[in-house]
Amino acid sequence: MAKKSVIQRNINRLKLINKYSAQREAIKNEIKRTSKVEKKISLYSNISRLPRDSSKVRLRSRCWVTGRGRSVYKNFGLSRHMFRFMASNGLLPGVVKSSW
């Protein structure tokens, strides 16, 4: 189980991403449309003034059961440990252990 503070930090990042996503996208679209270098530099400085945690890159995908941040399957939202446990106990519909 991940520490509660780490899970909460990720939740706070998600809130910041939702709050600043429209503003960040507007600036990025304006950068794409602009051809003047001076204007692009000023727009990049506008992006850098936004909170760092409002960037989507800083969000960590975590297991929804344990909060583990590594080896998380995106399709299920589970870490490899919980995926194996739940699949072997038949808790994931449609998942069958392969054998050949």
From Swiss-Prot:
It is found in: Plastid, Chloroplast. Keywords: Chloroplast, Plastid, Ribonucleoprotein, Ribosomal protein, RNA-binding, rRNA-binding. PROSITE patterns: RIBOSOMAL_S14. GO terms for molecular function: rRNA binding; structural constituent of ribosome. InterPro entries: Ribosomal_uS14, Ribosomal_uS14_bac/plastid, Ribosomal_uS14_CS. It comes from the Eukaryota. GO terms for cellular component: chloroplast; small ribosomal subunit. GO terms for biological process: translation. PANTHER family: 30S RIBOSOMAL PROTEIN S14, SMALL RIBOSOMAL SUBUNIT PROTEIN US14M. Part of the 30S ribosomal subunit. Binds 16S rRNA, required for the assembly of 30S particles. HAMAP family: Ribosomal_uS14_1. Belongs to the universal ribosomal protein uS14 family. NCBIfam families: PRK08881.1. This is Small ribosomal subunit protein uS14c. It comes from Cyanidium caldarium (Red alga). The gene is rps14.
